């Protein structure tokens, strides 16, 4: 949330989505494509994740990332990474090497140091651009989190989310992006979702799984959207926080929804039509077959 559409971001998202479609048509898995998308988003430096991540109050960048495969429900979340500029580099390498769901900080990065992914004893500093964003956002809900939800040719789904957090963070703060059921979730029987917004609200109301179940359980796509809108409004009413989501449910298809002013999202429709917006007023897109990348 909060990321505006610009010519640079539009060109980047268009190019990245077209590459993702190529991988889909070649039979790549939903999980691997979600990894590719979020890795590109991290490395672009355009968003509050990876190279563009902002600092916490002590000037240290701590990055969180999470992924889940709907086929086998395997999830991995890494949090408070300080020596890994692109958390996806570490997550992809660790994913098949551990049965754990959550790994944090120095212990997670110790493996990355041994395999030359993370830099020992060196903090990853924020870019000047990221610091300027942080200064503007002091005391406001987080924005610029990146994520992808994918349904592949076999019908499997996956979700990946990565973030640098939000402005005005106490050192050590952990948000929703590394927590399954909150900032991301994927289940072949339901669908896949990636969240953005104020992590404290997303965590306390388990927004990821709640929205996905509401969308999948509705009778039709229009009802599904209305159900999700009510849940987001409940989040704002009960916690004063806002959030946004990209999701695809197996029954009712894709949805882009947000309460904040902006949420930059790119979608690749049939016949290579690309739809990129930073505002998604209440229209249903459930009849459009597309790949979603946030």
Where are these regions (language model features)?
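Alpha/propeptide regions of enzymes that mature by internal proteolysis
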Residues: 1-294
């Amino acid at each position: 949330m909060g990321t505006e559409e610009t010519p640079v971001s539009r060109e980047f998202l268009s190019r990245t989505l077209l590459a993702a479609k190529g991988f889909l048509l070649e039979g790549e898995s939903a999980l691997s494509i979600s990894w590719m998308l979020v890795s590109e988003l991290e490395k672009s430096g355009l968003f509050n994740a990876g190279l563009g991540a902002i600092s916490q109050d002590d000037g240290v960048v701590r990055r969180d990332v999470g992924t889940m495969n709907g086929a086998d429900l395997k999830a991995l979340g890494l949090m408070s990474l300080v020596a890994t500029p692109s958390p996806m580099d570490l997550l992809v390498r660790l994913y098949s090497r551990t049965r754990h769901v959550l790994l944090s900080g120095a212990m997670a990065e110790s493996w990355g140091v041994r395999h030359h992914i993370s830099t020992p004893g060196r903090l990853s500093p924020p870019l000047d651009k990221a610091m300027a964003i942080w200064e503007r956002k002091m005391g406001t809900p987080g924005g610029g989190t990146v994520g992808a939800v994918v349904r592949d040719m076999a019908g499997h789904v996956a979700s990946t989310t990565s973030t640098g957090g939000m402005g005005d963070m106490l050192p050590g703060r952990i948000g929703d992006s590394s927590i399954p059921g909150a900032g991301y979730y994927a289940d072949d029987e339901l669908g896949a979702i990636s969240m953005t917004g104020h992590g404290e609200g997303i965590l306390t109301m388990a927004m990821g799984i709640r929205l996905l179940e509401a969308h999948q359980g509705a009778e039709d796509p229009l009802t599904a959207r209305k159900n999700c809108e009510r849940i987001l409004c409940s989040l704002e009413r009960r916690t004063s926080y806002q959030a946004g989501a990209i999701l695809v449910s197996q029954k009712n298809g894709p949805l882009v929804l947000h309460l904040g002013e902006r949420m930059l999202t790119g979608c690749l429709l049939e016949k290579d039509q690309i739809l990129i917006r930073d505002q998604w007023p209440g229209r249903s897109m459930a009849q459009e077959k597309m790949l979603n990348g946030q």
